[in-house]
Amino acid sequence: MNANVPSDANCRRIICDGEYATVRYVGNVPPTPGLWLGVEWDNHLRGKHNGTHEGTKYFTCSHPTGGSFIRLKKANFGVDFLAALRKRYGLKSEQNEELVIGKKTVELVGFESIQEEQSKLNKLKDVSLRECAVSNAGEKGQICHSCPNIMTADLSKNLFSSWESLAHISSQLENLTSLDLSENKLNPSSNPSSLATSFCNLKVLSLNRTGMKWNEILQCASMWPALEELHLVSNDISLLEQPVNNLQNLTILDISNNKIVDGNQLHTIAFLPRLKQVIVSNNIISSISFPDVDFGHTAMFISLTSLAVNGNNISEWCVINELHKLLHLESLNCHGNPLMDLDKNPETVRQLIIAKIENLKFLNKTEIFPTERRGAELDYRKMFGNEWLKAGGSQNEEFNKPSRDFLQDHPRYSALIKKYGAPDEGELKQQQPFALKNQLLTLTIQCPEKPDKKPIQKKLPDSMTVQKVKGLLYRLLKVPGSDLKLSYQSSKMEGKEIELENDLKPLQFYSVENGDCLLVRW
């Protein structure tokens, strides 16, 4: 083999004319003389064939036009870690240093610059070597000697091809806790547990767009005994398996932008004891359920406080009912699901979700203040009051026996009655339709005690309750979690201020009219 070819060239990653590829063959390709590299391109449009040339199969590609042959001189096999570090951070590699002859020290040219460079390298804690063609650790021991204080390293989109080559780097960085390896194509290790000491302090790992499937992650997981945060975005993952004796310290898992269809796949990770945050946005999930209990709290995800399901296919309220079973769920992000469009008024959807999930404190990254929760729960209790009565509910506790179907559709309704009391008949007779009226009032919103806040004009339905108006104003005015006091001045009764004291009454109850001024105090 040509002396210029790396001994481990096969399966190595290269760059050629700005395109990334993996070497699949090293050797002759008759009748053309000379050495050739058979490569599989990341961009299959760059290739010409599937590894077969003039009837002879030299290598295999995952795409029928993903392969081609190139000359050795066109392949860049990358640089070592320190070379890339010096280049990225503007440091020169000097070879001159002190020379000791007997007992006499001779200072060679460039020694001061070496000391200065070494000082700069020693201070580095967070480094980014993205797209720097890094492929190896370089000379043994040089990394720990030059930059031992690195804690966070971005090595995304480089030329690493094996976990062993990465272990040679990380084993020299004892303080390394966060590592980004996104967009590297890594071959599986034959003995991953033997590399655990090299990654023993690693807490955050990103493997986005690496093509690694979940089963491959589990095969590698013994390498990361202390891992707390794992990012696997855009890896075409469709199936999950239950981790056994690994990933037990995981607190954050990001599997967004994958191809998970069945929400029950999440059951496989439901018993990771420390898992607090799951991000499963932009998959194809339409349902999530926790069948271990019909009502009450599930034994799954016992530590989960935050869930993101943005951009999925969730369209049924039963999914929200299921999420109520998560005892510690405090934050939910669910934008971009069909459910959010079921009612044209996003405020109504928000109120329903808040009422259905008891411990929720943030919805779509917006804080839920106590007054908003109270209003949402009271509105929910009133909105479905007639349905509750028809299903066997009663203001008389002795006869209050709503059907199982009703309780499955509204699992929190009984708790809301215990909290606020049953809705009376008068309340239910005055119940407004589910959809808001078309009668909109143009109101000027003023904060008389906050002169720095400019008046705002807003169109509100006259059927909107005072409580819902308060919820809107909390977000609109970015008011801290204190009680709002609302009143209004009629355009027909100048100087007279009327207090809106009952949160459950609509604006029309107080005869608020078009052009009136809404006064907000806190």
From Swiss-Prot:
Pfam families, alphabetized: CAP_GLY, LRR_9, Ubiquitin_2
Query: Can you tell me which residues the record assigns to a coiled coil?
Result: none
Task: Set out the biological process GO terms recorded for this chain's protein.
Answer: cytoskeleton organization; post-chaperonin tubulin folding pathway
Q: Where are the LRR repeats?
A: 149-170, 175-196, 201-222, 226-248, 249-270, 274-295, 303-324
Q: Which UniProt keywords apply?
A: Chaperone, Cytoplasm, Cytoskeleton, Leucine-rich repeat, Repeat
Q: Where does the source fall among the domains of life? A: Eukaryota
Which SMART domains does this entry report, sorted A to Z?
Answer: CAP_GLY (SM01052), LRR_SD22 (SM00365)
Compartment(s) of residence: Cytoplasm; Cytoplasm, Cytoskeleton
Please list the residue ranges annotated as the LRRCT domain.
337-379
GO cellular component terms, alphabetically, are: cytoplasm; cytoskeleton
InterPro entries reported for this sequence: CAP-Gly_dom_sf, CAP-Gly_domain, LRR_dom_sf, Ubiquitin-like_dom, Ubiquitin-like_domsf, Ubl_TBCE
* Keyword hit for Cytoplasm: yes
- Residue ranges constituting the CAP-Gly domain according to the UniProt record: 27-71
Q: What is its main location?
A: cytoplasm
Question: What does this protein's UniProt record list under function?
Answer: Tubulin-folding protein; involved in the second step of the tubulin folding pathway.
What family name appears in the similarity comment? Belongs to the TBCE family.
Q: What is the protein's quaternary organization?
A: Supercomplex made of cofactors A to E. Cofactors A and D function by capturing and stabilizing tubulin in a quasi-native conformation. Cofactor E binds to the cofactor D-tubulin complex; interaction with cofactor C then causes the release of tubulin polypeptides that are committed to the native state.
Q: What is this protein called?
A: Tubulin-specific chaperone E
Taxonomic lineage of the native organism:
Eukaryota, Metazoa, Chordata, Craniata, Vertebrata
